[in-house]
A protein has these predicted regions:
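Flavin-dependent oxidoreductase catalytic cores
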Residues: 1-247
Length: 248
């Protein structure tokens, strides 16, 4: 049967002023917003928990806590968030934001049939982004995103949706398109890293398969019939790269 899962997020520095106030924890060049502190973050976390309870009471099957795509969760988890505060600086402090969020949602909704999971940007593709080796480098280091996935799994998450990039900054990484699709293979690499790290019962869902479509793309060195969404989705599920794929 189909499952109905709400995505919960706060846009942070990506908020549109016509909809909500743009805020940040450390101004990022080209974005920024009003700098907020620990009290405001704790209030936002309260609202996440309230939203999850509303979803549960409405009959939803679960929630996806978005730690991806440059939203507030990403902004806190990034190495770029190197300030000295409750959720800033060393990884052990930054990751605690996500761990606390999952624990608080599960405590508020103890029903084990209510699914909790997260969409994670494994590598945002710019200096200091998620999956980078430090606050001023873009070199890939999956230590933190893999530890994040394991940590939320230990706290009750039953699925992880793999993603990458930040659409406002690295769109071609986040959403490979037919014109420049090559970065889609990075997604497969990130998916396999997650699948190898997590428990067999934790569902890993892979992203970026839509670019393959019916084989009409500009990926080279493959026969068209081996370059489709159907082919790669089935292959990667069979090969143990992912358990499911996301389309959209």
């Amino acid at each position: 049967d189909p499952l109905f899962i709400f995505q919960l997020t706060h846009s942070g520095e990506l908020s549109h002023p016509d909809f909500s106030k743009r805020v940040c924890i450390k101004p990022l060049a080209g974005f920024g917003g009003e700098v907020i502190g620990e009290d405001e973050i704790m209030a936002i976390m309260d609202k996440f928990v309230t939203a999850a309870k509303i979803a549960y009471d409405s009959g939803a099957d679960g929630v996806d806590l978005k730690f991806c795509h440059g939203y507030l969760g990403s902004q806190i988890l990034r190495p770029y968030n190197d300030g000295d505060w409750k959720y800033g600086g060393p990884w052990e402090k930054r990751r605690q934001f996500a761990f606390d969020m999952v624990e608080r949602v599960r405590k508020a909704i103890p029903d084990k049939d209510f699914l909790i999971g997260s969409k994670i940007s494994m590598w945002e593709g710019f200096p200091g982004g998620q999956g980078s080796a430090g606050p001023d480098t873009a070199i890939i280091d999956l230590t933190e995103p893999l530890d994040l996935a394991k940590g939320i799994e230990e706290r009750g998450a039953s699925f992880v949706i793999q993603s990458a990039g930040s659409p406002s900054i690295t769109l071609a990484l986040s959403q490979p398109d037919k014109a420049v699709p090559d970065q889609v293979y990075l997604h497969h690499t990130f998916q396999k890293a997650l699948r190898d790290e997590l428990k067999p019962e934790t569902v890993v869902i892979g992203s970026a398969y839509s670019v393959f479509n019916d084989g009409n793309n500009k990926l080279q060195a493959r026969n068209k019939e081996e370059n489709t969404t159907f082919f790669w989705g089935n292959k990667n599920i069979k090969d143990g790269v992912v358990d499911m794929i996301a389309l959209g």
